[in-house]
């Protein structure tokens, strides 16, 4: 945990971290000295010359004042470090997210990322002052007191040193017992949170299927897993707590017995023995504090682990290359490209060339790799083997800005942000002037939509575009893609879920765009590709047919069969 925290400290604060560490250790030494000073103070106070206690009281006062000054300075440095870690971590996580490989962002890892981002607030700021400082003190103070006791009473000091080893070992064993169960409990809590969100978002489908009872849904499974993990966690924590409690009691008995034995032998006076009992109590106190800190330590360990998981997530490689021409439609080439999601292969040794300004349709059965090709062109994924070339430049060697500026994408399920229609369109290019914005709105026929709304393009779309229909969301999405001055336009199943009217609007918008672009269209509905110059038919991750629409229809192969089935489905009707 401490290693992870140190790694999160920005480079310009490493000096502050070193000073903080030195002062924290100095604070421990001062507190240990102040504790052991009680022995000569009490001995003098109850001895034959009580006035001899004044110098020892002076030393104790000086140690207390010095400790207060050091602790105040340490707290200030701790807050400084905490805010530095917070700021550095938030920027690191935010900068990392746009470059994380999409195949890493599974449901589980997305929950991890969400929890990491949500917890990088007060918990990180308070980590140093409220947890790290007490943790260092709780671990080092008993050892420092034991070392100081060696100078007063070597047998008692050595016994105290042995007690440090035993108690820290008992605490380590206790934490070891519960750590794995705590990890499982944390994972099930995250999973339960995700299922609750999913349960709320899918109420329409669940009610239609009569699956509204949580017990009959995945929420019930997640709740059961959470309950089981909580029971296992308690089953592990209780034996660990009993083990540490037993070790603490044995240490107290051992040290008190040692002090009594030394007093009986005459090696300690009665006042010294009384003071030793006070010192022993002070010696055991940090272990109790450490035990109380354990839940917070484990929680923080989980938080730092989630942050580390996001920062260590695999990212897309990027270089410093840039295409020679960022405005003209580029030549796109797949050179022996192989790609898979984890162990699941999707594309197998795919090669083709798309000429500048051409419109290419990619069709084929579900799962054949069509959308994956678009993702590779857009730079959302990178090939496992082979290369994707943009005007002869390997896309993996492009800098991030060039890679993102090269393509404009219309997704099958468009996502609209919680803002106005205008705001959502300008996401494509915030610097677009009014003429370019108006042209994109007109081409996508968004003007027909805004004309019906009381606030026009200032109308709010709601979270994820909930205030608009599916076709209306797609029109806004297309306007967003068209307003972006990208030389490559990628369209992924943009009409698959639309009615005939909206499908026609989408197709007209895409074909009416006069910007010189290289276009790649993935479609199941063949009406969407009637203007394509070329068709690639994919099956099983390979290109099995390549040619013009008329040429492939005349060949009577897979595409022809696909085409005929589309027409048969279009002619299908219910008869009485």
UniProtKB/Swiss-Prot annotation:
Lineage: Bacteria, Bacillati, Actinomycetota, Actinomycetes, Mycobacteriales
GO molecular function, one term: ATPase-coupled lipid transmembrane transporter activity
Description of its domains: In IrtB the ATP-binding domain (NBD) and the transmembrane domain (TMD) are fused.
SUPFAM superfamilies attached to this UniProt entry: ABC transporter transmembrane region (SSF90123), P-loop containing nucleoside triphosphate hydrolases (SSF52540)
Pfam family for this entry, one: ABC_tran
Record's GO cellular component terms: plasma membrane
Main localization category: membrane
Record's keyword terms, sorted: ATP-binding, Cell inner membrane, Cell membrane, Membrane, Nucleotide-binding, Translocase, Transmembrane, Transmembrane helix, Transport
Subunit structure: Forms a heterodimer with IrtA.
Name this protein carries in UniProt: Mycobactin import ATP-binding/permease protein IrtB
Transmembrane intervals: 26-46, 53-73, 132-152, 153-173, 242-262, 268-288
ABC transmembrane type-1 domain residues: 19-299
Function (record text): Part of the ABC transporter complex IrtAB involved in the import of iron-bound mycobactin (Fe-MBT) and carboxymycobactin (Fe-cMBT). Has a preference for Fe-MBT over Fe-cMBT. Transmembrane domains (TMD) form a pore in the membrane and the ATP-binding domain (NBD) is responsible for energy generation.
Cystines in this chain: none
Membrane topology type: Multi-pass membrane protein
Domain ABC transporter: 332-565
